[in-house]
Amino acid sequence: MKVVVRAPFYPTESLEKVLSSIFNLFDAPKESCAVVGEGKGRYIECVFHNHKPLEKFRRLLRQQRILDAARSYVERGLREGEVKFYLNKQAAFAGKVSFCTYEAGESPLGSIIVVIELGKCSPDEFLNWLAPRTVNGKPVGEVSELKCLEQGSG
């Protein structure tokens, strides 16, 4: 599994604040991130070769009780072997998960873009791990561990 988290980084923004927006949602070592590009085309990109950074994000979805909304946005972003979704950068700075429908327009300073290459994980297994369906607010069919990662895909 490979996880890429990317956020635009404008000249008027503080590097530390943009990094905080990412680290508030994803458990990640700072060394995994780099500034890419120049001027208005600059962005911060964090690349991880396992699912560990997603564990904090997964916890936040449960704490905020937004599993159904999260599942809907993540399902919408499912493509051939990968998932792509957008998060509001300002909400992330405050430690809150807020999904955006589009990459631009909903988050004034740009969205945080998350791309997950599923590797050997099936979309259903991944969805049921990250954001299972709920009934009366309780997760149903939840996968507690991604078994597909035990097969050596990280």
Swiss-Prot record:
HAMAP family, per database record: UPF0201
Highest taxon in the source lineage: Archaea
Organism name: Thermofilum pendens (strain DSM 2475 / Hrk 5)
Lineage: Archaea, Thermoproteota, Thermoprotei, Thermofilales, Thermofilaceae
Protein name, per record: UPF0201 protein Tpen_0695
Matching SUPFAM superfamilies: RL5-like (SSF55282)
Pfam families: RNA_binding
UniProt record similarity statement: Belongs to the UPF0201 family.
